[in-house]
């Protein structure tokens, strides 16, 4: 062995490399200054020989083979090559020859500021540093890999480009940061990879990339290298307008959400677990349907990659990768772009509460608890069998908040709906006594999760103005939608689970028994303005033997449809934004299942008239909602709602008014929750004028009997419901009737002024 090589060699690192334990390979491999000369070393298992050549190939140096394991070294008395400006020519035992740049000669692309910000939990573009990123370094094309694994003994990149051999590309640990990095030349898009991690206990595990931009199609679970910066967006006007939307603007705008699971909305091939339409195929179908129906937003379930179809996307393994079930990242970008082109906002279901135990996922990522809390009393959900994120660890909260920023910035997502917020807020959520760990004050509030959620909402508001975050929070936690500046959690909206539970229980009742449960109908107005609510009938309400919406309704066929029309009409009149799960707009009979399409055949079957009628009814409701701002403008302002009558439980009839931005086009709702036809029904009204029916759920085009009020009704000076005026109408059984009117102040009656007394001017007498 050349004496210079022997003197230069760090034999401890060499032994670690041979044993597969080296976490600092750049200190041993690559191009190193050595006095006035340089030392170039390489590790090429299964090779016969290795040479160093100039990029142009004119100069060639044979490397000395130090051992039979494939370690080579070359000492040059004078510096010939700068940095990575050389190539390695390796001849292998199978007769192949590979010419490539040296992975260990390239500079680290993660700076000290990146490390500092990540360790502090404040690096909102950390996804541009960690993960796998195709790029050019020193004129060489390849992919830069980086991963956070602080407990690991050694981390290697393995993939279809190196025979999945962990010995070939060990990564370099950056100081004490816990971040490993390596640039591998000639690895480009569509390369398949994982991280091979040697734990401190000597076990080798294979993990998917937490920051990977793309994953394989299940059941395969490796990552795929993708450049997500190439897509040319066409929604610049949409994005510019989005930036101008303030918190107050969002409250005043219509929000009518169609909740969707793309894989089961429509399938290309039924009875095939892989028979999905692609994102690009779905885009025009979804946009056309949603626009025609009059929805303003879609909410997408199951977009971040997940392994198990039955989880519906709520057990995520790849937070930065859209699922491959429907295409690659650019295909999903096209889908979002297409929605924006058609004026449709896109909401993404986002799951920062927990993650699954799949071996390739985040659990015990580097052989020890890393993303999850190390104490199982805080780190595991016994009911769900999942891990809970360690919200108090800076890098973990950074991973989650940066992910929210990522979807808004890189995929132009307009809003995130945070799943299972209650499970984050409470340390004892779903746990038995003795199986949870109290906070430092002895309570059950999760201070770390609270802090993370507040930071999430503040960060999104600052970095992505116009993007909002919705909480699915099922308890009475105060201040969920209060701004962070007021010590609230900072969410823009909260799902109104209380209204949903009470109202659905009310609607399930036989109409006779509704009179004894009248408070279930009216109680929600006691707290309707305590938060910024969205009224939801979500996927959770039409699964697990809860029945579809139509089959929750009591009665025979016609009564069920009449009840459902009444339910939807009352929902649209109630303060709060709206959300309805797919299939319920045309009264799907079966519960929803992720394995099959919605039952679209009902619209062409023997009972098509009923299903088309309810679909047309929801469509009409949606378009009226978008037309009259009384439906939404004052959702968060008490002046936007006023009861006319809510205290007549025996008749189960309620009436109320909704006010918009002006005195014009205000709305009067009259809702009959019994099967009693009431012709000549009197209802008090707020003012004089004409009341024009704009919706009657009993109209024939909706599947009703046609008992409507075709002519405008004039308010009469007959006091009723504590009002000075009233109208007399036909109120069909099990119906909602909506009237439009222009509010007019009562003109004061002019009173005759008292006649002024006149005194005849006296004429003085002549003397």
Locations of regions flagged by a protein language model:
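The feature marks proteins involved in alpha-glucan
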Residues: 1-35, 58-62, 66-149, 174-259, ...
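Surface-exposed beta-strand/loop patches in extracellular or lumenal glycoproteins
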Residues: 40-44, 50, 148, 155, ...
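Conserved, mostly hydrophobic/aromatic
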Residues: 42, 147, 195, 260, ...
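C-terminal beta-strand-rich structural cap/linker in extracellular carbohydrate-active enzymes
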Residues: 82-85, 189-193, 711-747
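Substrate-binding/active-site clefts of carbohydrate-active enzymes
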Residues: 214-216, 236-255, 261-445, 766-767
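Conserved alpha/beta catalytic core and glycan-binding cleft of carbohydrate-active enzymes
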Residues: 412-414, 432-594, 626-698, 705-706
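Intrinsically disordered, polybasic Lys/Arg-rich low-complexity tracts
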Residues: 746-767
């Amino acid at each position: 062995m050349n004496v210079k090589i022997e003197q230069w060699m760090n034999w401890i690192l060499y032994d670690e490399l041979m044993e597969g334990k080296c976490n600092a390979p750049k200190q041993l491999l690559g191009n190193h200054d050595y006095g006035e000369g340089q030392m170039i070393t390489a590790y090429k298992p299964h090779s016969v020989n290795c040479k160093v050549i100039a990029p142009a190939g004119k100069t060639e140096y044979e490397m000395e083979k130090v051992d039979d394991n494939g370690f080579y070294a070359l000492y040059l008395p004078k510096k010939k090559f700068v940095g990575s400006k050389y190539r390695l020519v390796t001849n292998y035992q199978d007769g192949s020859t590979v010419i490539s740049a040296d992975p260990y000669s390239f500079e680290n692309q993660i700076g000290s500021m990146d490390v500092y910000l990540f360790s502090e939990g404040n690096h909102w573009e950390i996804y541009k540093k960690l993960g796998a990123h195709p790029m050019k370094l020193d004129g060489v094309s390849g992919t830069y890999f980086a991963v956070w694994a602080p407990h690991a003994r050694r981390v290697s990149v393995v993939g279809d480009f190196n025979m999945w051999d962990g010995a070939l590309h060990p990564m370099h640990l950056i100081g004490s940061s816990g971040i490993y990095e390596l640039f591998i030349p000639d690895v480009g898009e569509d390369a398949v990879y994982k991280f091979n991690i040697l734990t401190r206990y000597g076990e080798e595990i294979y993990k998917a990339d937490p920051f990977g931009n793309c994953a394989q199609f299940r059941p395969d679970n490796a990552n795929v290298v993708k450049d997500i910066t190439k897509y040319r967006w066409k929604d610049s006007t949409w994005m510019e307008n989005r930036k101008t939307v303030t918190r107050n603007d969002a409250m005043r705008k219509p929000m009518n959400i169609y909740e969707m699971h793309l894989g089961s909305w429509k399938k290309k091939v039924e009875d095939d677990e892989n028979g999905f339409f692609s994102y690009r195929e779905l885009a025009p179908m979804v946009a056309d349907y949603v626009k025609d129906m009059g929805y303003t937003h879609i909410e997408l379930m199951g977009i971040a990659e997940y392994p198990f179809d039955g989880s519906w996307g709520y057990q995520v393994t790849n937070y930065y990768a859209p699922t491959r079930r429907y295409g690659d990242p650019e295909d999903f970008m096209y889908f979002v772009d297409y929605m924006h082109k058609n004026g449709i906002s896109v909401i993404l279901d986002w799951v920062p509460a927990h993650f699954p135990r799949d071996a390739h996922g985040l659990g015990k990522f580097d052989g020890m608890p890393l993303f999850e809390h190390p104490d199982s009393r805080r780190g595991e959900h016994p009911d769900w069998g999942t891990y809970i994120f360690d919200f108090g660890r800076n890098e973990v909260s950074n991973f989650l908040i940066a992910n929210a920023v990522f979807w808004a910035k890189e995929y132009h997502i307009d809003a995130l709906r945070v799943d299972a917020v209650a499970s984050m807020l409470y340390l004892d959520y779903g746990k038995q006594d003795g199986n949870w760990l109290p906070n430092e004050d002895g309570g059950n509030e999760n201070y770390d999760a609270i802090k993370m959620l507040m930071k999430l909402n503040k960060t999104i508001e600052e970095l992505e103005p116009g993007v909002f975050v919705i909480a699915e929070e099922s308890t009475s936690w105060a201040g969920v939608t209060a701004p962070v500046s007021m010590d609230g959690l900072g969410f823009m909206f909260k799902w109104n689970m209380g209204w949903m539970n009470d109202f659905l229980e009310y609607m399930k009742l036989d109409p006779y028994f509704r009179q004894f449960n009248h408070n279930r109908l009216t109680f929600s107005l006691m707290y309707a303005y305590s938060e910024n609510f969205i009224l939801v009938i979500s996927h959770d309400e039409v699964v697990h033997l809860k029945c579809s919406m139509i089959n929750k309704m009591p009665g025979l066929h016609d009564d069920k449809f009449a009840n459902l029309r009444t339910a939807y009409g009352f929902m649209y009149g109630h303060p709060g934004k709206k959300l309805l799960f797919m299939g319920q707009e045309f009264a799907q009979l079966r519960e929803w299942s992720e394995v099959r399409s919605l039952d679209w055949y009902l619209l062409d079957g023997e009972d098509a008239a009923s299903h088309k009628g309810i679909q047309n009814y929801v469509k009409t409701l949606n378009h009226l909602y978008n037309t009259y701002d009384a439906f939404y403008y004052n959702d968060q302002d008490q002046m936007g709602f006023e009861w006319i009558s809510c205290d007549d439980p025996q008749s189960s009839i309620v009436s109320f008014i909704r006010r918009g931005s002006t005195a014009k086009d205000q709305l009067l709702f009259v809702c009959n929750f019994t099967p009693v036809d009431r012709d000549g029904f009197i209802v008090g009204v707020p003012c004089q004028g004409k009341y024009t029916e704009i919706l009657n759920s009993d109209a024939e085009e909706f599947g009703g009997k046609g008992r409507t009020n075709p002519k405008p009704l004039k308010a009469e000076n007959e006091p009723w419901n504590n009002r000075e005026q009233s109208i007399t109408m036909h109120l069909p059984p099990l119906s909602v009737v909506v009237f439009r009117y222009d509010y007019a102040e009562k003109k004061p009656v002019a009173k005759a002024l008292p006649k002024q007394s006149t005194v005849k001017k006296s004429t003085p007498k002549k003397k």
